[in-house]
Amino acid sequence: MGRRRSHERRDLPPNLYIRNNGYYCYRDPRTGKEFGLGRDRRIAITEAIQANIELLSGNRRESLIDRIKGADAITLHAWLDRYETILSERGIRPKTLLDYASKIRAIRRKLPDKPLADISTKEVAAMLNTYVAEGKSASAKLIRSTLVDVFREAIAEGHVATNPVTATRTAKSEVRRSRLTANEYVAIYHAAEPLPIWLRLAMDLAVVTGQRVGDLCRMKWSDINDNHLHIEQSKTGAKLAIPLTLTIDALNISLADTLQQCREASSSETIIASKHHDPLSPKTVSKYFTKARNASGLSFDGNPPTFHELRSLSARLYRNQIGDKFAQRLLGHKSDSMAARYRDSRGREWDKIEIDK
């Protein structure tokens, strides 16, 4: 027969004890570990009863208070649906929306669909760390950036009070792709001679205009008027008017001469075209550039340069030849004043590139 409880202990719930100094402790019946509850008898009894209920139920049932608190709570996946609507209302370009959609799908896969306010920093950090462990630090950075915005919008609509993502570490990712020099460009250009002529024309057009491969493939002869090549960048929406007199001195490539060679090579609607006069895809251009690069015999530190590196080479050569501001304008990178002017014109005006040597 167990020892009878004293008067002070008689009305206490199981597992709650009072010390001689009037201090209450709760003993976990599973481990024997004790937890201090202070000297307030009413609070100690309430917390002990709640703990006993939780331990007895084995957490199989959601408590009443949790049900009350969660009645109007939005879950992560439901909020991501709302977030996609918010993105569509921002006027973001379709390509950028597709990029967002890819990251949102990853978030849905990796994080549990529970009340948004219950998503913890620990859960987010664990999810991001899985990408880092797989050597995908760049993906971790992009997904983290998206998640920061997801919760920022949730705060704006009153669903959560804090952002659990901002406390996580930003993954460090190294740019492993090698830069391309002018001499290496020439070596790859010569290695491309056995390949279709459109590859060398695309290379020259890329380096003299500084544009992305996707925009190169979309260039049409109808884009040329008033002695300028007009380009609307698919990624940024920047509208550039590049003078046909533009020449990149380090490689002795002029835009006018390159366009003339393109005209002689094909009668297609697009400036760069296959031997059958069909438009080329960015994937095809990049693949053939890789063939020429591999055939050149050049070796590189880190990952070898891709066709996209021609844009960086163009920027560096023009920076040395004309200046940094010119290079930035040619690439479509706007200064604050230019961005303001572009916003004011609602994108109707072309940024006419001027050569000021």
UniProtKB/Swiss-Prot annotation:
Domain Core-binding (CB) positions: 74-155
Which CDD domains does the record cross-reference, listed alphabetically? INT_Lambda_C
Which branch of life, at top level? Viruses
Q: Where is the Tyr recombinase domain?
A: 175-355
InterPro entries in the record: CB, DNA-bd_dom_sf, DNA_brk_join_enz, Integrase-like_cat_sf, Integrase_catalytic, Integrase_lambda-typ_DNA-bd_N, Integrase_recombinase_N, Integrase_SAM-like_N
Which of UniProt's keywords are assigned here?
DNA integration, DNA recombination, DNA-binding, Hydrolase, Transferase, Viral genome integration, Virus entry into host cell
Q: Does the keyword Secreted apply?
A: no
Pfam families cross-referenced by the UniProt entry: Arm-DNA-bind_1, Phage_int_SAM_1, Phage_integrase
**In its keyword annotation, does this UniProt entry include Transferase?**
yes
Which Gene Ontology biological process is one annotated for this entry?
Answer: DNA recombination
- The active site of this protein is located at 212, 235, 308, 311, 333, 342
Q: What is its EC number?
A: 2.7.7.-, 3.1.-.-
Please list the GO terms describing molecular function: DNA binding; hydrolase activity; integrase activity; transferase activity
Protein family per UniProt: Belongs to the 'phage' integrase family.
What functional role does this protein have?
Integrase is necessary for integration of the phage into the host genome by site-specific recombination. In conjunction with excisionase, integrase is also necessary for excision of the prophage from the host genome.
Output this protein's name. Answer: Integrase
Q: Which gene encodes it?
A: int
